[in-house]
Amino acid sequence: MTDALRYLTERDVVSVLDIPKAIEALHAMLVAQGREQARNLPKALATWGDGSSMHALGSVQTGAGGYAGFKTWVHTKSGGGSLFSLFDAESGFLRAVIEARALGMLRTAAISGVA
């Protein structure tokens, strides 16, 4: 893998990820978590003003080829946005920044398929 940082837009995400792939990925990570090869970071939340909020959560897959990632997002009355930062879990190198709205929707939909 090269050391180039990738930026993926919402369009990029939906062009390469679909529900079957998301189900497969979630299943694999739940198995890894059961084997103590993956961990989740509890969600953090802060609020301000009249209903604005910021959120963060993350997970890591340990071992060779593992990744650590954080989804962060903000909601305000004027709008919001979300990003996923993906790191190499061994080197700590930032591999990608991914626009995360579609990614989150696919994950939420796919978890039902895992069940």
Residue spans of the language-model regions?
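N-terminal ligand-binding/catalytic initiation module
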Residues: 1-105, 111-113
